[in-house]
Amino acid sequence: MSNKEKGVNVQVLLRCRPFSNDELRNNAPQVVTCNDYQREVAVSQNIAGKHIDRIFTFDKVFGPSAQQRDLYDQAIVPIVNEVLEGFNCTIFAYGQTGTGKTYTMEGECKRSKSGPNGELPQEAGVIPRAVKQVFDTLESQNAEYSVKVTFLELYNEEITDLLAPEDLKVALEDRQKKQLPLMEDGKGGVLVRGLEEEIVTSANEIFTLLERGSAKRRTAETLLNKQSSRSHSLFSITIHIKEATPEGEELIKCGKLNLVDLAGSENISRSGAREGRAREAGEINKSLLTLGRVINALVEHLGHIPYRDSKLTRLLRDSLGGRTKTCIIATVSPAVHCLEETLSTLDYAHRAKNIKNKPEVNQKMMKSTLIKDLYGEIERLKAEVYAAREKNGVYIPKERYYQEENERKAMADQIEQMGVSIENHQKQFEELQSRHDSQVQQCSDLTCKLDVTQKQLNQTSKLLAYTEEQLRQSQYTLKERDFIISEQKKAENALAHQACVLRADLEKSIQENASLFQKIAREDKLSTDNRSLVNNFQAELAKQLGSLSSTLATSVCRQTEHLQCVEKFCHNFLDSHDKAVLDLKRKINSSMALYISHFEAMQNVVRLHKATSNATLEEVSTLASSNSISTKEFLDAEAVEANSMFDELQSTLSTHQGEMAHFARELRQRFNDSTEHLTNISAIIQRFFDKLLDESKRLEKHATTVDEIQTNSIAEFEKAYEEQSKSDAEKLIADVTSLVSNHMRRQKELVGARLVDLRETVSGNRTFLDGHVSSMEGITTDAKRKWQDFYMQAEGETKENADFSAAKHCRMESLMQKCVSTAETALKRWQSTHELVNDMGNQHVLTMHSVVRNICDNNEQHVTDFDSTRESAEEDVKRNSEDIIKSIDSLSGEERGSISGVLDTTSAHSETLDVLKKDHCMQSTSIEQIALETFQQKYMDYEPTGATPIRSEPDVPSKVTIESLRAMPMEVLLEEFRENNSFESFQVKEVKPSLIPRSPFSQINN
């Protein structure tokens, strides 16, 4: 589809005037911003408290600082040039009143003659500048031309001719301003009947007419503009230019420029229009609204365009959607009080951009045709003038006359078009005739050329025979050369093939070398990673083993100190216990010896009394009294000694109780210290705990053996002691003195022997334990490298040991309380014995008095009483001995309990060692898993990728093979070819005719 069928969009320009003096004084806000370079206009709005900018884009934008010359040079000059090319063009200004439409179109025309050389002032508008450009261009082209102008005004839907003579104007006013009618021209346009056309020859004449017509325009003062145009004006310039064709014919080119200054739309409330001015504003707005509806209909491509709703739209019909090029200049105000009209103007102008016109160049007319038409028009006008003057013409109704006139003009146009068509056909015939004549001339020329060519053909035949012989020789030579070339090509192909094979082998070798280098790089990287992994593992292992060694050394020292403390406590306890037993035995022996000596003294006194009873009765009574007193003193002394002994025993037990409490506190403190140190002990001690478990089992077995030996020894001691006590008790009746002495001696010897055995056993056990401790130290030294942390398990076991120590402490305190209660029981028993002895002494005194009184009569009875007293004393001694044995048994039981407590403690430590063994197993397993994961999973072995090339031997061609690929010398090849192909048998091949025409050699040579 051509541009003519598509159409051309209406060009829309936007011009924003600067602020007026009143607006500057009132500091009116600016709501319109122009961007000349991007051809955009931004309008600021506040809608519902929000600031919104609307942006419109036009073909060209001129801001407040733009001058009249800038607008004309950039936008109007091309349009005027198109008018001179034969187009019809329209320029009209559209916008609110007071925005500079008339200033843009007309400017200051009155000053146009004041400049030098007829130059226009800076304020000159589009119309004077267009007129000056038209005449300047025509004068520069030295063309023959004629220019006609018309100037009409549309006021309240009435058309007035602004160029009509003054007398005619008065006549029209006298006839109540008869308006000029609009008529259809039969070509889709309109014409104004009776409109005066002024022929002008210079720009100054047009300026004069323009000033005269502008002075007649209706203007009025409003609040928005002191000289507001109250009507629309249309200034038309019609140009006829004569052109000469190459054939010498003269044609007339016609162009028309319509310059429209529209009245401004206005808001009556802001413009202050009243009564007549309000009606004028209403008519103006009505015509502008119709123009807006026409624009909308054209943009939306509606079926009906309301051109006939207003005379303004009828006048602009060809400019909006017709065959005219149109330019719209939209003028706006930057002030905020004109925002509504500004937005309306911008909306209509933006929509008008989408209107498409289909401009056409006006058909050129022949000068003769134009003159003929003009003569006919003159004759018609003369006839009309004559008929009007003579009043003898035909009078018909006005409507019929207009209709016939329109039909006549339409027929005239058709006749004119047919004449033009006939002329075109005549031209085509003349062109065909000239072509025929030229073809005949060409035919005669070709005949002459044919004769000349025949002569040249004969000469060429002779030359051809000679040339064929030369050609035969040349072809034979070429055949030889072809044979040589083919042989060399074969050799070349063989060499090229061998080179390709060698190149393929070389590429394969390069690829294999690259694969080998990649493999070496992978192996190097893998070795580096494995070396780094092993170094890190070795450093971490050394760090953990160093920590294990230091922690193990500290723990071993603590355990050794703890065992030494326990051993020291046991030795101290045994020493103090041995001292207490020996002291108790010594005091009992001394008491028994003193008692026996006094008892023997009593026996001697009794015997003496029996011998001298008859002679010394009075002395017996005295001796009895003294005996009673001495016995009382003896018992008092013995009581004092017994009390001191029991006080000493009680103090000893108190000391033991304090030592046990101190031991418990020290043990608890050591367990706490052990807890703090055991939190840092590691668990990888499998071999150590295996050996330690064996040693513990041996130690436990030895302790069990020692315990059994001690138990058997104590049982044998008890059994021997009981047997000896029974035998001594039986013999005591016969001989009390010897019995008690032997009994105490044997008891001392037996106890001493047992104590010696116990000391030897303890010494042996100590030696055995020292040996095992040294063995354990050796084992510990070997296991120092394998410890790890087991914080949570050791902490739990430490708490259990602390609880166990607390329980043992409570147990020891209960035993000490039991010892204290036993001592108190012995004290009470001794006091009861002391009282019993006192009672017996008193009874003995009374008996002695009775014996003294009845000594002679009851001597035998005294002996009997003495025997009974002796038996009672023996029973008391026996009972006292049994109590002492029971006390010793109780003490032995407590010793066994203490030993069993020590064994329990040892067993608890053995259990702790078992737990440590289990933890060590777990930690050892963990380290083994870490090592396994490090050396089996993380430690990467090289895995073959399958891309490593297999060793292969290259196929290297031999030197003989390479030499065989050489081509034979040229002389040998020529000799071989000539033997197989003689020159006499060689036939010349038929030469194909060349498709490219060539000149004969003779012509080339000549």
UniProtKB/Swiss-Prot annotation:
Keyword vocabulary terms for this entry: ATP-binding, Coiled coil, Cytoplasm, Cytoskeleton, Microtubule, Motor protein, Nucleotide-binding
Q: Which GO terms describe its molecular function?
A: ATP binding; microtubule binding; plus-end-directed microtubule motor activity
* Domain of life of the organism encoding this protein: Eukaryota
Taking the first listed entry, what is the main subcellular location of this protein, grouped into a coarse class?
A: cytoplasm
Give GO BP annotations, semicolon-separated.
microtubule-based movement; mitotic spindle assembly; spindle elongation
Q: Per the database entry, which stretches of residues form a coiled coil?
A: 371-522
Can you quote a single GO CC term?
mitotic spindle
Keyword hit for Coiled coil: yes
Q: Which SMART domains match?
A: KISc (SM00129)
Chain residues that bind ATP: 95-102
Family annotation (SUPFAM superfamilies): P-loop containing nucleoside triphosphate hydrolases
Where is the Kinesin motor domain positioned along the sequence?
Answer: 9-355
Q: A Pfam family this protein belongs to? A: Kinesin
UniProt key word ATP-binding: yes
Q: Where can this protein be found?
A: Cytoplasm; Cytoplasm, Cytoskeleton; Cytoplasm, Cytoskeleton, Spindle
Describe its function: Responsible for microtubule translocation. May be important for the organization of phragmoplast-specific arrays of microtubules. Plays an essential role in stabilizing the mitotic spindle. Required during mitotic cytokinesis.
Q: Extract the PANTHER family matched here.
A: KINESIN FAMILY MEMBER 11 (PTHR47970:SF12), KINESIN-LIKE PROTEIN KIF11 (PTHR47970)
Q: Which family does it belong to?
A: Belongs to the TRAFAC class myosin-kinesin ATPase superfamily. Kinesin family. KIN-5/BimC subfamily.
Instruction: State the protein's name.
Output: Kinesin-like protein KIN-5C
